[in-house]
């Protein structure tokens, strides 16, 4: 007997398990809006060294993130990019809320080299470059995001 797709309890548990894993990898901490989380992950490099800077992000997510890119620019400058023409997002072409920076910015890419269950033991290498970037933008949270920004970056889709 072959179980029917999505009606079998086993298939349902597998599907829910996969969704849970996927969701946890892309989840933001509840206390932040998507724009605030974007700023923490991609603008606010609290230290010039990836290992120290990633500790902030990893503490919120309670795991060592495999890689991350910090744009060495201001949140206001990235918000300005949201005003550039919309384009399909390279990582998901069904979404049309991405915007190309139009100018290169300095950035630091952090790559996990020493994973650990203990967040403070995770180690990263870093690479610096000047690159264009593509961000996804959405309407801001009218209560929790700065009122001067009606549209805000919510996802760093790609660096080029």
From Swiss-Prot:
- An annotated GO cellular component: extracellular space
Q: Where does the protein end up?
A: Lysosome; Cytoplasmic granule
Where on this chain does substrate bind? 65-69
> What are the transmembrane regions?
none
Q: EC number(s) for this protein?
A: 4.6.1.18
Write down a Pfam family by its short name: RnaseA
CDD domains according to UniProt: RNase_A_canonical (cd06265)
InterPro entries the record matches: RNaseA, RNaseA-like_dom_sf, RNaseA_AS, RNaseA_domain
Top-tier EC class: lyase
Q: Using the record's annotations, give every residue carrying the modification 3'-nitrotyrosine.
A: 60
Q: Name one GO biological process term.
A: innate immune response in mucosa
Reaction(s) catalyzed by this protein?
an [RNA] containing cytidine + H2O = an [RNA]-3'-cytidine-3'-phosphate + a 5'-hydroxy-ribonucleotide-3'-[RNA]; an [RNA] containing uridine + H2O = an [RNA]-3'-uridine-3'-phosphate + a 5'-hydroxy-ribonucleotide-3'-[RNA]
Position of the signal peptide: 1-27
Give the glycosylated residues: 34, 44, 92, 111, 138
SS bond list: 50-110, 64-122, 82-137, 89-98
Q: Which family does it belong to?
A: Belongs to the pancreatic ribonuclease family.
Q: What does this protein do?
A: This is a non-secretory ribonuclease. It is a pyrimidine specific nuclease with a slight preference for U. Cytotoxin and helminthotoxin. Possesses a wide variety of biological activities.
> What PANTHER family does the record tag this protein with?
NON-SECRETORY RIBONUCLEASE, RIBONUCLEASE
Q: What is this protein called?
A: Non-secretory ribonuclease
The organism encoding this protein is Macaca nemestrina (Pig-tailed macaque)
